[in-house]
């Protein structure tokens, strides 16, 4: 009876979180628009809907994931504004539920899981409201991080297999921040495998990665996308933009430290807890428990 009531409570929380996260993004998605950014994927999603292909029929620097997903929403709901915002609201609801699931698996009290997930839903997609590559890339990357954390916690190979798919969707939404997250998780996976003295999990990761790459190549072939077009538009051309921005970076104390001081302050309690655990147990750094906070710091 107790387990049944807990299960019903979980279902109620999940349903409430999805509805709230969906509605709040719908609200902010209809508050206003940016002349260029807001309509970018409305146009591209419609172009995919009528048969045009990214890279082949139109220049795509930001990544095709958002365009293809948006075309699905347009197909079922019609090419209208509500269908456009439904897309980002659905992603907001999906990542909110995943957040709740992850927190619950780390044995946080269910009321706290609900509260933190609720706060997450307010900060995840509503700042944009409408579908945008930065948010898709960040949130798909977050799902990849969630899968990695659950893999470390549960030792379930399924989560290890999911990581490349989420990170792949993130990369094909936008190259950054997905690339940074990919390297951080690869480092964490390498450290974990070294500590466990096994490459079994790396093998699962690589198998899943190869499957994802194979599916992407097949999809690109069926869509008639030339690899040279993809390489020029999505890999080489963005590097020219990145090079220009990198040369304009302000490598001063204010530019590197002071400007991000509140982000760095968040690391202080995390680093302190790890230091304290290392003092209490000299075996802490020799185990695998510290990999989770290490990944969080690297992110």
Regions found by a protein language model. Give the residues of each.
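Short acidic/glycine- and proline-prone juxtamembrane loop motifs at membrane-interface regions
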Residues: 127-137
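Membrane-interface transmembrane helices that cradle and orient dolichyl/undecaprenyl
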Residues: 104-107, 144-160, 170, 195-196, ...
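Membrane-interface alpha helices of multi-pass inner-membrane proteins
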Residues: 158-177, 181-186, 294-299
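Transmembrane-helix signature of polytopic, membrane-embedded enzymes
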Residues: 94-122
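Membrane-lumen/periplasm interface segments of specific transmembrane helices
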Residues: 202-245, 256-262, 269
């Amino acid at each position: 009876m107790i387990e049944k009531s807990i299960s019903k409570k979980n279902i109620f929380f999940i349903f409430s979180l999805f509805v709230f996260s969906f509605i709040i993004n719908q609200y902010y998605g209809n508050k206003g628009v940016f002349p260029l950014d807001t309509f970018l994927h409305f146009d591209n999603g419609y172009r995919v809907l009528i048969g045009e292909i990214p890279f082949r029929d139109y220049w795509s620097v930001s990544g095709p994931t958002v365009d293809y997903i948006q075309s699905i929403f347009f197909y079922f709901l019609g090419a209208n504004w509500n269908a456009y915002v439904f897309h980002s609201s659905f992603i907001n609801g999906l990542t909110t539920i995943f957040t709740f699931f992850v927190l619950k698996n780390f044995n946080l009290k269910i009321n706290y899981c609900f509260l933190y997930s609720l706060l997450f839903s307010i900060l995840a997609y509503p700042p944009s409201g409408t579908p945008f590559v930065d948010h898709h890339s960040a949130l798909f990357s977050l799902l990849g991080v969630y899968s990695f954390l659950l893999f470390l916690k549960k030792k379930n190979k399924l989560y290890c297999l999911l990581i490349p798919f989420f990170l792949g969707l993130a990369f094909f939404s936008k190259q950054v921040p997905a690339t940074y997250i990919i390297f951080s998780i690869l480092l964490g996976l390498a450290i974990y495998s070294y500590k466990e003295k096994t490459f079994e999990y790396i093998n699962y990761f690589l198998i899943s990665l190869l499957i994802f790459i194979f599916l992407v190549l097949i999809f690109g072939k069926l869509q008639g996308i030339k690899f040279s077009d993809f390489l020029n538009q999505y890999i080489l051309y963005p590097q020219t933009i990145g090079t220009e921005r990198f040369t304009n970076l302000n490598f001063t104390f204010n530019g590197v430290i002071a400007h991000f001081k509140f982000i760095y302050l968040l690391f202080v309690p995390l680093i302190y807890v790890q230091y304290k655990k290392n003092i209490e147990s000299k075996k802490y750094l020799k185990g695998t428990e510290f990999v989770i906070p290490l990944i969080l710091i690297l992110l």
